[in-house]
């Protein structure tokens, strides 16, 4: 074994297995491409992206960690979102006020 080496189990690994999924249509109304990373709280994505932000509350893209989706200007596309997990707190983006996503 090499230090840091990871051995995965045989078979297919399903990302976000069992997580509820939400599909939303998104259009980039800006004049430049926009990329959104895998763990961005989707409603906080660039405001040139037009979609139902309230339906996306507490959700992120259903894509592998460290990847992103690129939205070209004027092009509509459908994305699949899954709930943010863990403590469900978002800090350092545009959430006003930052912090817990769910009411306490």
Swiss-Prot record:
One of its GO terms (molecular function) is urease activity. Pathway: Nitrogen metabolism; urea degradation; CO(2) and NH(3) from urea (urease route): step 1/1. This is Urease subunit beta. The keyword Hydrolase applies. Belongs to the urease beta subunit family. It catalyses: urea + 2 H2O + H(+) = hydrogencarbonate + 2 NH4(+). GO terms for cellular component: urease complex. It is an enzyme of class 3 (hydrolase). Heterotrimer of UreA (gamma), UreB (beta) and UreC (alpha) subunits. Three heterotrimers associate to form the active enzyme. Pfam families: Urease_beta (PF00699). One of its GO terms (biological process) is urea catabolic process. Keywords: Cytoplasm, Hydrolase. InterPro entries: Urease_beta-like (IPR002019), Urease_betasu_sf (IPR036461), Urease_subunit (IPR050069). SUPFAM superfamilies: Urease, beta-subunit (SSF51278). It is found in: Cytoplasm. Its EC number is 3.5.1.5. Its main location: cytoplasm.
């Amino acid at each position: 074994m090499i230090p840091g080496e990871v051995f995965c189990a045989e078979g297919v690994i399903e990302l976000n297995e069992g997580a509820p999924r939400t599909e939303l249509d998104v259009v980039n109304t800006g004049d430049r491409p926009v990329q959104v990373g895998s763990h961005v709280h989707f409603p906080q994505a660039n405001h040139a992206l037009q979609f139902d932000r309230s339906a996306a509350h507490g959700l992120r893209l259903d894509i592998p960690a460290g990847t992103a989706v690129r939205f070209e200007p004027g092009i509509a596309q459908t994305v699949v979102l899954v709930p943010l997990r863990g403590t469900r707190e978002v800090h350092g983006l545009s959430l006003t006020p930052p912090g817990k996503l769910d009411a306490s």
